[in-house]
Every structure is written in C-alpha cells, then in structure tokens.
Amino acid sequence: VLGNGDTVFIRPLTPDDRPTLAEFHRRQSADSIYRRFFSPKPELSDKELLHFTDVDMVDRAALAVESHDELIAWASYERWPGRSEAEAAFMVDDGHQGAGIATLLLEHLAAIARSNGIERFTAEVLGDNRAMLAVFAKAGWPLQRRFDSGVVDLDWELADTDEFLDSVERREQRADSRAVTRILLPRAVAVIGASERPGSVGDAIWRNVANSVDVPIHAVNPRHDEIHGHLSCRTIDQLPDEVSLAIIAVPARDLDETVDACITKRMRGAVIVTSVDGSDVDVPALVTRARRNGLRIIGPSSMGIASPRPETRLQAALVDVALPPGGVAISMQSGSLGGSFLRKARDVDLGVSWFVSLGDKSDISANDLLQFWEQDDNTTVIAMYTESFGNPRKFARIA
C-alpha cells in the first residue's frame, strides 16, 4: 500500500521481463533516464536488459512494481565484491513519481539485502535530484554523504534504528488511513445489484443509500433502466468514471465477474454485502486480483458502512437505524451483533462518527480502521468487535 492509498504489486524481476523493461525505459523522459544512468540512454541494450533481470536475489536483486499489470517502477541492488555492502538504484515511471513508490522499494530491498548478510547500502545520486535525495534522507537511517563533481555519494547502515522504525510506522499509518479514506469518503457511489424487489438486499441497500448520501449515486441492475425513480445502468462499464466506491449486492455466482468489472472501471473501493458461504468463490484469489489493481475490499458478508455526521453523511448499510452524530466509531465483524449494537446505540442516544461492518475481513482489517480513526478529528472513542487478528502485533502497536 502506497502513502496515497493506492495498492501496487511488488515482485522480483526475471529474464522474461526484458521486453517489458525495455518498453518501460523507452517511455521515460530524457531527464528521468539521465538521473538514473547519469548519461543519455534512449534504449537499454540486450546485455543491460539481461544484467538487470537475471538476478539471484542474494548478491544481486531486482524488484518490479506493477499497477494494473503495468510496470511502473523497478529497483535493484548489487553487492560490492567481497564486501557486506551493496549499491542500490531506483527508477520510477514519470507518471507515478511522488507517490512513495521509491520509499516502499527501498524498504523491500533493504529487507532482502539484510536477509542475505548485506549490512550497508551505497547510492550515487545527482546533486539536483532532490526527490531521490529526500527519499533516502527520510528513510530513517543516518546517512554519510560525500559530494564529488555534481554527484552525492551516500552510504548508510541497514540497521533498525528508532528513526527507521518510526519512518516505517508513519508510512504505514498514512497508507492504511488513506486506503480507508477512499472507501469511507467516496467521490461517487454505485450500488451494484440495486433492486426494487421488496425485502431484497439490493432494495434495502439502495433505499438507504439514496436517502442519505450527499455525493452522486448510481444504480446497476442488468434488467432495469430505472430503480425507484433513479436511472439505472445495465452494466458496470456504463457508469461514469467518477464512481470510486461500489456497494456490491449480487449473487455469489456473479461476484468474480462484478469485481473484475469494478477493477476495469478503476474503482478504488468495494463493500461486498454478498455472502460467499457455500459458494465456489475463491475469496483470497479475488482479493489478490483486486489489490493488484488498486481496488480495496470490505467484506464479503459485510452489513455495510455508515456515517450520520453531516459532513460525511452516508448510510450504505443493511440496518436502517437513525443514529445521532457523535464521536464513537464502531467496527463489527459479526453482522447480527452489529445490528444489535446500532439499535442499542440509538436507544441510548449514543453519538456515532462511523459504523463499519468488516464481515469476512478479507482485505480491509481492524488495523486499517484504527489507522484511519487515529487521525479522524470527529472520532474520540472506538468500539470494536473482532473475532480474529490477522496481525496481532500491529494491532497492539496501533491500539
């Protein structure tokens, strides 16, 4: 997860990536190429492509970063012969610079290097490459610097200093928080599986969303052009590009196709109300596919999300309970308990900032919500029920 909330896929480069790396290089600006190679280099030679991709991930390592199956960055290190030091280098696509990709790559490269007995990194950076110098400076390691002929030579120990650990924690907090922000504060919402059939999940969700949210809303139903007086799209690809959040209430058999269509539409979040119990849906594979392409998921089997506060008003939950706005954020994994809790909160006039039903908790977790609510000025108390911890150490650190 990047600092802006986007998700990317990081993997080792292999010789099969030579054509992809060559194409990536060709589409970069002359300035970016010069800052990486210190000379004009419109093309990478076959020898260079093989050198960069044929690595053992011990003395020489190289990582690729992909978004929507496109290579958007790569980084490498090479061990100095006979030493426990390696030189690191990075290149990020012109259109993705400034998103924290180099910082994330640096952390991953350092972890690989340390596991292979490499104790120090070195790097050469052009003196006017302020963005890359800032990446190293903010990583949390004490740097040794030497300036020679317009080039800054950097040298640092790959140690778990307090500054490094704090830097990683701050980056994680920003990334997790912004990923949740994109779901809870959408630009526009689509209810996929919206229905007019009384008593159906699609009907309940659509009615609640239509009567609450202040951002544009859209319905998707393959058999209707109108839902309760609102125009409805037959397919997801007919939705406007502004839609960033999907509330999914379709049969389990249609879930994979629906999520793939949301990915193609480049949505940022999905709340899956659909239950997959007893179905053939491969949830881990679905989530992996979604995350690789920038789509974060709450659910499946979620009761939805809600906020009664005027500035964030949204009622995309199955339980239609009128709650007073306040400072209590509620996270529930159990759907039935969530409904009971909301009704009790209403009865005792408990002011609520957010309600999130995590359901099966396949992607967005309690830890992610904690990171978001930690920086939310409207939240003063967190009430949370969870049946398991995917990362208990991280939960304890955040809480």
Language-model regions: role of each:
Residues V1-R182:
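Long, contiguous binding/interaction regions
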